[in-house]
Amino acid sequence: MEIVTKIEDLFLPTKHHKFCKDDSFERITWEDVIDNIDRNVCEGAFPPLKLRDNLGIVSHDTRDILKTYPIRQLIMDTRPNIHPTCHLYASLTSISETFGKHDDFMDVIIWQCIGITRWTIYDEKVYQYDLKPGEFLYIPMGMFHDTTPVTPRASISFGLENRPPVAI
């Protein structure tokens, strides 16, 4: 696993996964998570809030979580053609359902906010790592991975879909 010391280096294209710890961003709290869920339910967000088995939650509408904005801005400053998507994943128990082994159609950066999530990454070797609060993990497009909540947890994913500039 490649370890970088500056969070900006996570946003640079690479074919390997990378890891970084950075406590300079204001942490997401359970209050932020509950407020986001409440707003999604009350406003009927689209795409809708997903409640998964065993108290797992996926929120595709995170505009109200202002603590994500400095990271979104850093992504856009570092990769100008990227307008990041942002999703909240919360597991209220350590047995919450996840997506299983899968790959994504875009690069993804995970920000572990609360609790611990075990990541299994299938590269040339299989890596397992327990991501803790304040840590970031970069997963390149097409790299298979799986997650398991070790404790109740909340994390934010930033999808780095490359969108070429549009000519007007």
Q: What positions do the PLM features span?
A:
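An N-terminal JmjN-like helical accessory module and its immediate linker preceding a catalytic domain
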Residues: 1-34
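Conserved beta-strand-loop-short alpha-helix elements that form
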Residues: 138
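Active-site region of the double-stranded beta-helix
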Residues: 9, 31-135, 143-168
